[in-house]
Amino acid sequence: MSELKTVGLFAITALAEIAGCYLPYLWLREGKSIWLLIPGALSLVAFVWLLSLHPTAAGRTYAAYGGVYISMAILWLWTVNGIRPTTWDIVGSVVALIGMAIIMFAPRSV
C-alpha cells in the first residue's frame, strides 16, 4: 500500500474512532439524544473494521496510527469544538506524524 493510501486510511480510521467516542460523549455530558448511541456504535464498528485493513503487523499499525489519531483529534478540536489549536498542539501533532512516518515507512527486512 502506498504511503498516501496508508496515511489516508489512518485518517479515516481516526475519524471513525473520534466520532464513535464523541457521540456517546454528547449524550452523557451534554444531554443530547440517546439515539446518538446508534451512529456512535456504528462508527466504532467501522473503526475496528478499518483497522483490520492496514497491511502491516497489528502492533506496528496501532503504534503508527496513534500519531495520526493525535493530529485528527487536534483537527477535531478546531473544526468541531471550535477551539483554535495552540502552537504546541500543532508542534505535538507534527512530532507525532513524524513518529508515525518513521514507524510505518522506515526500511525493514521483515
Curated annotation (Swiss-Prot):
Cell location: Cell inner membrane
Stated name of the protein: UPF0060 membrane protein Psyc_0916
Similarity section: Belongs to the UPF0060 family.
Family annotation (HAMAP family): UPF0060
A GO-annotated cellular component: plasma membrane
UniProt KW keywords: Cell inner membrane, Cell membrane, Membrane, Transmembrane, Transmembrane helix
Superkingdom of the organism of origin: Bacteria
Pfam families: UPF0060
Organism, as annotated: Psychrobacter arcticus (strain DSM 17307 / VKM B-2377 / 273-4)
NCBIfam families found in the cross-reference section: PRK02237.1 (NF002586)
InterPro entries: UPF0060 (IPR003844)
Topology versus the membrane: Multi-pass membrane protein
Chain segments annotated as transmembrane: 7-27, 33-53, 63-83, 87-107
Main location: membrane
